[in-house]
């Protein structure tokens, strides 16, 4: 993050790396395979993932996090940023290499979920269009640019703390679902035995 005077205020390192696009999976466990891949695949990237859910203070009221591109596909990344104080999420994405596909639309759909899960507004800025401002309720706060449409968007964003059950208790939500499915499985198994008698 750089301020208007050109001073570096902080740094965020991408956490959710794309296998073979940004990292070689399990390269620590299979160093021979990783070495072979590096030798035989041109332009293979191998970044180290970030470890901090960075939130930048813009002023007393606004704390911004900027998950990069596919970081938003990990609910834990955005949740960690918001739990670390972010009350605005700005996602920057390079989706041009997907061409004229549904990738950008899918990205916007995922961003709506991140806004709803964490009850924070989200700004999506992409180099291939579909950029949009999304409110904490998942609704558009601005028009949405078309695919590969250049333009400028403005919107009024309400920054205020809102409670999110998911953000605060995600582990319990997932644990509850696992318990529910376990109980349903046991019930189905028991009922199946009863009806066979």
Regions found by a protein language model. Name each.
Residues 1-197:
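Enzyme catalytic cores with a strong preference for nitrogen-chemistry domains
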């Amino acid at each position: 993050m750089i301020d208007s005077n050109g001073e570096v205020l902080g740094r965020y390192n991408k956490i959710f790396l794309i296998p073979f696009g940004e990292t070689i999976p399990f390269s620590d466990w299979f160093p021979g395979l990783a070495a072979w891949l590096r030798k035989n695949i041109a332009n293979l990237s191998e970044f180290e993932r970030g470890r901090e859910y960075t939130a930048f203070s813009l002023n007393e009221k606004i704390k911004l996090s900027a998950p990069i591109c596919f970081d938003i596909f990990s609910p834990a990344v955005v949740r960690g940023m918001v739990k670390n104080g972010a009350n605005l999420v700005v996602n920057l994405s390079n989706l041009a290499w997907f061409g004229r596909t549904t990738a950008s639309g899918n990205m916007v759909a995922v961003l709506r979920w991140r806004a709803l899960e964490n009850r924070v507004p989200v700004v999506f800025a992409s180099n291939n269009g579909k950029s949009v401002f999304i409110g904490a309720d998942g609704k558009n706060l601005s028009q949405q640019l078309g695919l590969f449409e250049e333009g400028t968007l403005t919107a009024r964003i309400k920054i205020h703390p809102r409670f999110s059950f998911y953000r605060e208790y995600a582990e319990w939500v997932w644990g509850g679902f696992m318990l529910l499915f376990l109980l349903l499985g046991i019930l189905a198994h028991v009922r199946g035995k009863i009806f066979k008698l």
